[in-house]
């Protein structure tokens, strides 16, 4: 019981300074401006970086001190959209600044955790590819898996409530509520494709969404890790984390939710989350996976008021199932090896069956992505990039080389690279056709005139691609992961990887 109480009191004991006064500090907006200049290439440039100045910031702060109007009245929000096409610079600036302020508690928690554990910071710079060695170690020993789509909250208030454990400043939460209430529809459904935050303030939206996912996973994994210490009897679960230990102490006196859930233990359950999805895998029977499925559905419904249909969560055998994971088509492939054994004068052959994680390059989705951005047609035949024909030759070649290098870098861990070479061929020929179109010539004539050295930059050897080597996280394996495949210096996923 004490372990439960200590776990939850840890969040209570974290005291931070008030965040609300920071919104009146000029340095916050300067920091947001600097981050905007260095933002990822995947985020749209909304024009805020070019128009921000110290004079505008001071004018914004003076306007916020007004008592009658916070920024712009609700009646004017239709003409000056908060996340529209930059018609309201003040609203955009304050939302960028507020996103920086909300990140402060998370940054302080990360720094304190690194100082307490004395963790080498370079080990925390792992890329997304560091997930694959974990799958290689765990998944071949499992039998069933479910690809689960993490549901989005229906009500924006749920996103605000998930921050109440890390932000001890009620004024900041009220300010966030004011943003959402003043400029958005309260009942708007947040979806990954049509999010209200998608174009303008991705930083704030991602922070809210990641907080929501972190809240969901922290409760789920906490219950999972502590399941071995609980009796296998049915009981009513308190999902409110600050009152969970009360349920352990008083199992009969208090009832919060009417639904009775069965808690069960499975020492072989594995959980991986990525891009708004999660994979739940187990070595046990399909019956236990079915229990986990209905447990997740009731968990989302009771705690986050999110309805998810159980029929959309499918349980698949890993031998017969390929799942799309971070742009790769991953599956468990049996590898049979013949071993000859000899005992005295008798010798015999044994078939040794080993399971191996197979990661394939997604050829068809990648061709569809290239066709969408006009590098080829739907059949994979290269075409010229007409929108780049006005650029200089060096810029055209540089852009194609950069795209090909990023794809080669990202998919260098593929089990079979023949499909990757086909994509690189499409990019090379599309580059040549674009140059030939610019110079009003044919591909054959253009290559004959300039020679084969034009495209030498495309033929970068895979061994020359920079890779980061880190030791495995598993304590049972002390050796370095020697294959230069998964530990790469990739910090984000290119748009071409998002096939959906």
From Swiss-Prot:
It is found in: Plastid, Chloroplast. This is Maturase K. It holds the Pfam family MatK_N. InterPro entries: Domain_X, Maturase_MatK, Maturase_MatK_N. Keywords: Chloroplast, mRNA processing, Plastid, RNA-binding, tRNA processing. Usually encoded in the trnK tRNA gene intron. Probably assists in splicing its own and other chloroplast group II introns. One of its GO terms (biological process) is RNA splicing. It comes from Argentina anserina. Belongs to the intron maturase 2 family. MatK subfamily. GO terms for cellular component: chloroplast. It comes from the Eukaryota. One of its GO terms (molecular function) is RNA binding. HAMAP family: MatK (MF_01390). The gene is matK.
């Amino acid at each position: 019981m004490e372990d439960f109480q200590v776990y939850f009191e840890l969040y209570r004991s974290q005291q931070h300074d008030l965040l609300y006064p920071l919104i009146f500090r000029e340095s916050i907006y300067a920091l947001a401006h600097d981050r905007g200049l260095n933002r990822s290439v995947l985020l749209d440039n909304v024009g805020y970086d070019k128009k921000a100045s110290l004079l505008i910031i001071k004018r914004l702060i003076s306007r916020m001190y007004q008592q009658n109007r916070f920024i712009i009245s609700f009646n004017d929000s239709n003409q000056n959209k908060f996340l529209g096409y930059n018609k309201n610079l003040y609203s955009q600036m304050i939302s960028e600044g507020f996103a920086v302020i909300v990140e402060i508690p998370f940054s302080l928690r990360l720094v304190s955790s690194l100082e307490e554990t004395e963790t080498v910071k370079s080990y925390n710079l792992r890329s997304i590819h560091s997930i694959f060695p974990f799958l290689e170690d765990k998944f071949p020993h499992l039998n069933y898996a479910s690809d689960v789509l993490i549901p989005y909250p229906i009500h924006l208030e749920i996103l605000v409530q998930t921050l109440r454990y890390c932000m001890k400043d009620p004024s900041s939460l009220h300010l966030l509520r004011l943003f959402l209430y003043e400029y958005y529809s309260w009942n708007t459904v947040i979806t990954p494709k049509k999010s209200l935050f998608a174009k303008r303030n991705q930083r704030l939206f991602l922070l809210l969404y990641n907080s929501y996912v972190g809240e969901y996973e922290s409760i789920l994994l906490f219950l999972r890790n502590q399941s071995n210490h609980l009796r296998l009897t049915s009981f009513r679960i308190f999902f409110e984390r600050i009152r969970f230990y009360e349920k352990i102490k008083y199992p009969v006196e208090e009832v919060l939710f009417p639904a009775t859930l069965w808690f069960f233990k499975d020492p072989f359950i594995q959980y991986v989350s990525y891009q708004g999805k999660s994979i739940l895998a187990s070595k046990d029977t399909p019956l236990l996976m079915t229990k986990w499925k209905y447990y997740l559905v009731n968990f989302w419904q009771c705690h986050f008021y999110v309805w998810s249909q159980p029929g959309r969560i499918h349980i698949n055998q890993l031998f017969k199932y390929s799942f799309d994971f971070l742009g790769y088509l991953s599956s468990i492939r049996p590898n049979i090896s013949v071993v000859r054994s000899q005992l005295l004068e008798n010798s015999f052959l044994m078939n040794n069956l080993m399971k191996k994680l197979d990661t394939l390059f997604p050829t068809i989705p990648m061709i569809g992505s290239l066709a969408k951005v006009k590098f080829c047609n739907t059949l994979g035949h290269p075409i010229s990039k007409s929108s780049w024909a006005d650029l200089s030759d060096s810029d055209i070649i540089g852009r194609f080389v950069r795209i090909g290098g990023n794809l080669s870098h990202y998919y260098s861990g593929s089990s079979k690279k023949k499909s990757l070479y086909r994509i690189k061929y499409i990019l090379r020929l599309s580059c040549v056709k674009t140059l030939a179109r610019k110079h009003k010539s044919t591909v054959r004539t253009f290559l004959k005139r300039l020679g084969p050295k034009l495209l030498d930059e495309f033929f970068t050897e895979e061994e020359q691609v920079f890779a980061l080597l880190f030791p495995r996280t598993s304590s049972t394996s002390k050796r370095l992961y020697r294959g230069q495949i998964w530990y790469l210096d990739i910090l984000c996923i290119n748009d071409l990887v998002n096939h959906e």
